[in-house]
Amino acid sequence: EFHISVWLAPGMNIHRNPLCGRNFEYYSEDPLVAGLCAAADTRGIQSHAGIGTSIKHFAANNQEDNRMYVNEHISERAMREIYLKGFEIAVKTAQPMTIMSSYNLVNGVHTANSHDLLTAAARDEWGFAGYVMTDWGTSEDMSGLFAYKYNLKYGHSTSRECVLAGNDLQMPGQK
């Protein structure tokens, strides 16, 4: 209807656990390699009119098992040098259409509710000009669509905080 297609990729998470069920979607354990590959894919995909990429899962979502329940404790240095560097490279060199936030928490804050990640880092520091979207069913009012709505150790991100943090779209969207 809108004649815009968004490829829900590339996945840019870092290979940290060989048992991660989605490592096949991610490029590398090296954030430089991940960033350069994602930027190349983004430029190629977005060279076609009306098609964009969604770099994901922003950020530090490096395990598939338990990813909706995990609170990653990461130092500022490790966050910037390992977990954000690939995203920074992709944004600065290719300007993807969208960034998708992840389900996990980083240092006690849901990534979808993190102003530090979505606005301060992505938009203000790196110059991201696209839109930010949540992963599917991340926020409380979208959770009823999915089986994992119950027994979340840290609860859901909230719609209000999603908007205040810098999300432009909560997925799945509705007409």
Residue spans for each PLM region:
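Glycoside hydrolase catalytic-domain context in secreted enzymes
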Residues: 1-175
